[in-house]
From Swiss-Prot:
It is an enzyme of class 2 (transferase). GO terms for cellular component: cytosol. It catalyses: L-methionyl-tRNA(fMet) + (6R)-10-formyltetrahydrofolate = N-formyl-L-methionyl-tRNA(fMet) + (6S)-5,6,7,8-tetrahydrofolate + H(+). The lineage of its organism: Bacteria, Pseudomonadati, Thermodesulfobacteriota, Desulfuromonadia, Geobacterales. This is Methionyl-tRNA formyltransferase. NCBIfam families: fmt.
Length: 311
């Protein structure tokens, strides 16, 4: 069967395995729509989105509109007349006028088991909330926020120490596998739609840096889940002598002490009281310094029992 003519819309690393899979399948990817190049680093040099790099390597035309809902952009996409638009972490909301263009509509790859965790940061919030399972849902897009009919779901278990980076990487690969199954079913006419039950939904809003502030009165597992969900960005944090201290890896310890008080230090980590127990800090970063193991951190920063973290 001849490949579908597809416009791919996506921007970050998460979207790359799916674009690569579409190319490998022999689908006719007629254009890639992505965000504009952004200035990065100290020199503020313009850096292309990862998806653009892959598209250019394969000679696929790239569109980078400031606003995809602009009438001239919609007209440009309509002129391309795609069979299907595949959307993965694009970063802009698509207008109804664009959703109606392809004969097979627009299919989105969403990094949760819908209807749970609609929104911009499902990977982070499922970790923060202590979920043990998540996955990928392909969805027939409508004008709402992740409210379209579900097509294919694939689930995976979440490791007890897994952070947002490792879960992101696994789900990005699972997304490519899920689009495989979705397109296979579409092309043989066995793709079915399932309505979302709005009563079962919860939301995963974009992370704000201030949401990562650690409350040492919370229970150890709650704080550990916050750290997992905020690693590597934007980082769960506390303060030490007025400086921001980001925590990247922690484990639940057995000691009990006052919330925020350092109870013990050693090569295995820094034990801090919290809730009705304690946490062991294993990787951390003080403002202005590199991310280090607790052992390396202690070699350059003297900490003693009784010092308090946070306000």
């Amino acid at each position: 069967m001849a490949g579908l003519s597809i416009i791919f819309m996506g921007t970050p690393d998460f979207a790359c395995p799916t674009l690569t899979r579409l190319i490998e399948r022999g689908e006719d990817v007629i254009a890639v729509v992505t965000q504009p190049d952004r200035p990065k680093g100290r020199g503020q040099k313009l850096v292309p989105p990862p998806v653009k790099v892959i598209a250019e390597e394969h000679g696929i035309p790239v569109l980078q509109p400031q606003k995809v809902r602009a009438p001239e952009v919609v007209a440009q996409i309509r002129e391309l007349n795609p069979d299907l638009i595949v959307v993965v972490a694009f970063g802009q909301i698509l207008p109804q006028s664009l959703l109606e263009i392809p004969r097979h509509g627009c299919i989105n790859i969403h990094a949760s088991l819908l209807p749970r965790y609609r929104g911009a940061a499902p990977i982070n919030w499922c970790l923060i909330n202590g979920e043990t399972e998540t996955g990928i849902t392909t969805m027939q897009m409508d004008a709402g926020l992740d409210t379209g009919d579900m097509l294919v779901k694939r689930s995976i278990s979440i490791g007890p120490d897994e952070d947002a980076q490792s879960l992101h990487d696994r789900l990005s690969l699972l997304g490519a596998e899920t689009i495989d199954e979705t397109l296979d079913r579409l092309q043989v006419g066995t793709l079915t739609r399932e309505k979302q039950d709005d009563a079962l939904t919860c939301y995963a809003p974009m992370l704000k840096k201030e949401d990562g502030l650690i409350d040492w009165k919370q229970e150890p597992q709650q704080i550990k889940n916050l750290v997992r969900g905020f690693t590597p960005w934007p980082g769960a944090y506390t303060t030490l002598d007025g400086k921001t201290l980001k925590l990247y890896k922690v484990s639940v310890a057995t000691e009990c002490g006052k919330p925020g008080d350092i109870m013990a230090v050693g090569k295995d980590g820094i034990i801090v009281g919290c809730g009705s127990g304690s946490l062991r800090i294993e990787e951390l970063q003080l403002e202005g310094r590199k991310r280090l193991s607790a052992q390396d951190f202690l070699a350059g920063c003297r900490l003693e029992p009784g010092i308090r973290l946070g306000h």
